[in-house]
Amino acid sequence: MKQVGAFVAALAVGFTLLFPALPAQAHSDASPPFELRFPQETDKTRFSNDWRARRSGGRRHSGTDLIADAKMTEVYAVADGVVVKVNDNPRAGRYLIIEHADGWESYYIHLNNDGLDDDSGDGPWMLTVAPGVEEGALVEAGQLIGWAGDSGNAEGNSPHTHFELHFQGRPLNPYPYLEAAFERDHADLLRRMQTLLNQIDGSVQIT
């Protein structure tokens, strides 16, 4: 019996060496590719990876908060698509959803609901979404779609856009996509600024 047990153990070790275990859920956790445009001006936005951070009531954060310098900071479509929802509710506040190709959707939550010079919470929708942005409207990547605010349960917090990215009906961590978009768009901003400076004074260099 001891010899049989030793043989089985040796066989198991050999099998492990030949066929090492793959990381659990390696395939299901891989993020599918999706190149997007950063949804706010890079020089007016701060953000971090707050995916699944704890929230009140035992909730987990299902997106990334893009902290804006001020209310009415411009919000842009991250990719071409069609607006499928423009709505308001107590938690999300004023928000919109864009459906993109290949099963992707982007959510823009806590949009502005105040007037230009008040914190009333009942400002006109013309200060929430851009002209022509309504359900069924086609939008392009980088198109102005609305303005950041503190509507819903974000009231009293720093103005921001709670941004979500969904793929085939399920939310994904948007941070890696946003980080890549931020780097691309910010580099483009610096190039445009350098071009402008070159036209004024070629000796000034942006680093």
Question: What residues fall within each predicted segment?
Answer:
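Positively charged n-region of N-terminal signal peptides that target proteins for export
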Residues: 1-4
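Short, conserved secondary-structure segments in the cores of folded domains
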Residues: 71-74, 129, 135
